[in-house]
């Protein structure tokens, strides 16, 4: 069975759109609460929760993560950059796993995979430090053979393949098949290297039909489409629907 990790970042995005200048990020009239929505997602069948604490704190705050941990029922996958500050925060929070991602302050969302090869010394240092503190680390990368090999070289136990190009190409059959084959080859190489392979970015209720055909996929991390659907159907139904699609 393919596992479903639910990314809750955009619950925090909605809150910050209205209350980012408040001294507190929760309580009283400040809503929605990312921690509460994460608990709802767990009750609805999520196998894990992903939260991305960015350096610019544009959505999820450290306090959101800590509050979620108070009552969490599954596991926390914390997305962070490789900065010294964020690595220290990860060690303080002690999530069940960390996923290292690139960050660009001008981007709306993560635009591509981490360049592990081009930052291999720092990536190796971060993986070693977090692993020594009992936190397994994955690398959010494009399905590029060199990036997969670099991830294996530094001792990352798994990777998350960036599916954004596939998601954008879904409505163009020629491009869709090309991107799906690229992901499939990335999956094959990852497995040969002994990596566990997750995937995510841009997966929705339509293109998941193609994405789930990837052999050996362990887990999808999905956020925006689930949160978007929840505005119509509620978060519990949105998680349950995605869970059922993965199980078909």
Regions found by a protein language model. Give the residues of each.
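Conserved N-terminal beta1-alpha1 strand-loop-helix module at the mouth
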Residues: 1-77, 91-95, 178
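C-terminal helical cap(s) of enzyme catalytic domains, especially alpha/beta-barrels
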Residues: 171-176, 229-248
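Glycine-rich, proline-tolerant flexible connector loops at the mouths of alpha/beta enzymes
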Residues: 47-67, 72, 102-115, 163-174, ...
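Hydrophobic faces of well-ordered beta-strands that scaffold small-molecule active sites
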Residues: 2-8, 49-51, 76-80, 96-100, ...
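Glycine-rich phosphate-binding active-site loops on the catalytic face of alpha/beta enzymes
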Residues: 99-107, 158-170, 215-235
């Amino acid at each position: 069975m393919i596992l479903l990790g639910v990314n809750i970042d955009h619950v925090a995005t909605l809150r910050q759109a209205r209350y980012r200048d408040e001294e507190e990020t929760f309580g009283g009239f400040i809503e929605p609460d990312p921690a509460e929505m994460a608990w709802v997602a767990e009750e609805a069948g999520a196998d894990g929760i992903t939260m991305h604490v960015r350096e610019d704190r544009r959505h999820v705050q450290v306090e959101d993560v800590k509050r979620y941990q108070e009552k969490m029922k599954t596991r926390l996958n914390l997305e962070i950059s490789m900065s010294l500050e964020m690595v220290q925060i990860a060690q303080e929070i002690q999530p069940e796993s960390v996923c290292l991602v690139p960050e660009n302050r001008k981007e709306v969302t993560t635009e591509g995979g981490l360049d592990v090869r081009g930052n291999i010394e720092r990536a190796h240092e971060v993986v070693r430090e977090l692993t020594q503190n009992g936190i397994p680390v994955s690398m959010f990368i494009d399905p590029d053979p060199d990036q997969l090999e670099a991830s294996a070289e530094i001792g990352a136990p798994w990777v998350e393949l960036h599916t954004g190009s596939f998601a954008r190409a879904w409505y163009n059959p020629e491009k869709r098949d090309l991107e799906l084959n690229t992901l499939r080859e990335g999956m094959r190489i990852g497995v040969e290297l002994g990596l566990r392979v997750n995937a995510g970015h841009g997966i929705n209720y339509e293109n998941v039909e193609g994405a789930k055909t990837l052999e050996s996929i362990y887990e999808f991390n999905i956020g925006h489409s689930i949160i978007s659907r929840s505005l119509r159907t509620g978060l519990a139904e949105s998680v349950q629907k995605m869970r059922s699609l993965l199980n078909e």
